[in-house]
Amino acid sequence: MKKLYKITPYVMLGLMVAGCTDLDTEPLSSTITSNQKEEVVESDPSRLEASVAAVAANFTQYAKIYTEDDNVHSDIGYPTIMLATESRGTDMVADITGYNWYSNSADYSDCLNTSTATIEFWGTLYNQIFTANNVIGTVDNETEDPTLQYYLAQALAVRAFDYFTLIQLYQFNYKGHESAMGMPLITEQNATEVAANGCARSTVQETYDFILADLNKAIELLTATTKERDDKRYVSLDVAYGIRARVYLAMHNYAEALKDAEAALAKTTATPYSRADVSKPSFINIEDNSWMWGILITEQDRVSTTGICNFPSHMGSLNYGYASVGGWRRISPKLYSEIPASDVRKGWFLNGEGVSANLPAAAQTYITGKKAPAYTQVKYGVLNDQWGTDNNATDIILMRVEEMYLIKAEAQAMSGNVSGGVSTLNSFVTAYRDPSYQCTATTPEAVQEAVWQQRRLEFWGEGMAYFDIMRLNKGVNRLGCGFPTTAVFNITAGDPVQIYSIPNKEVQYNPLLENNPLVSAPTPIPDVESVSYTHLTLPTNSLV
């Protein structure tokens, strides 16, 4: 039987687990209070270090929602949200095959309240929220200890990130939906009550207010502390500003998004990838100057030792995994045709003849031998340029500095400074991606469209595309995008199928929880602008 993840019992489990730690018992095994815990960590902040590391570790772990015996190879943490949501859009194409674990997202059957996708999303994000709550509940909110300020900021920032992700998955965008149902807000203060009685959904407004309160406090703490992060797994001040810039952008509060994007750029040491940097397969190393925040993967991590249950397996074309044996991730030929030849990003994908100018000769030989379809992505590299490697211990992007430039450009234009937005956009693209680029937009909306086009190219495969579709009130028109016949749709903006249903078992267990309207997958339509691919027919979803 599959182990379904539910909020209420997991809250209780979290309380039970917390009760087994050395922070919860005195030497004679008497249970101590929350105030006493705060006193313990104030006297020895190092006792909280492992809990803070666990918050970051929760971003990607294998088989934490299901069990390993269930063999659900998409149960890999936050990266499964990236892959599933990318599969729901218009720009990432893949065959509906047993080797594509995200076929249900591509054909929208993941809209069901029993889908693996919604169970994984809900469980992954609330699991991390509960881990963050354990840290938050152990530190005095007004602590002046630099280490504890830093630890508390980590938990608050990640909790905000998780709730922000949830609200984008389970509800339409903020603007115009402020009174709609948001998320159940589980905190360090109400966890026991939730475990006993369940939790209702807050409104969208209340959810965003909560997210911003966490981020505001995290920024306050990161400004005050003198402790620096050990590596980019953790949230620094520039990253916290970056997360808040995303939130304000989603809220259409462009003036505040602009302030935070500029603050992030002022505080960060990150610099954009140069044209030379991305003229070859890249995007796998957290130490790259462009990365502000990421998921650090080691060869010892379970997602790595599985070999095939990880982001590179499902995404990568140049390494061994599900993608390279039939689940090939490809750019829409329609979007590919819109990339100028002068733009280095055109080489992030094979052309119609299966060739990319960005590939070293050995990599081109490898992928030609694998018979990869036209338009297959070669954006993502492999460890040590070992083409075909089964070592998939590569890092995963959560935030790059390029995003801050594009938020700045959009926010400038949408808050009234159209010429400033155009200037920021032109400066960024010509310096780092396409020296011939020129945006000549004269209205805020036209600049926003131009920025959206750049985001579609720049962050292809990085888990942002579907959230952009939602915040910009776009539909999903796949005509001419090269999708399999069972996944060709023209979904209008606001269609209920665009948001996920809460897992059925969660609603059954939590009497206070109201679900989104239950919907069925849309009916495919004929693709009157169809594009031919070379397809591989592969019958199973198990690699040996």
Features from the language model and the residues they span:
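Membrane-proximal, proline-rich intrinsically disordered regions
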Residues: 20-80, 315, 326-327, 335-340, ...
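Short, surface-exposed recognition loops and adjoining beta-strand edges that mediate ligand/DNA contacts
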Residues: 29-35, 70-81, 170-179, 183, ...
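Hydrophobic-face positions in mid-chain alpha helices that act as interaction patches
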Residues: 63, 70, 258-401, 435, ...
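Sec-dependent bacterial lipoprotein signal peptides
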Residues: 1-18
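Conserved small/polar residues in nucleotide/adenosyl-binding loops
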Residues: 534-540
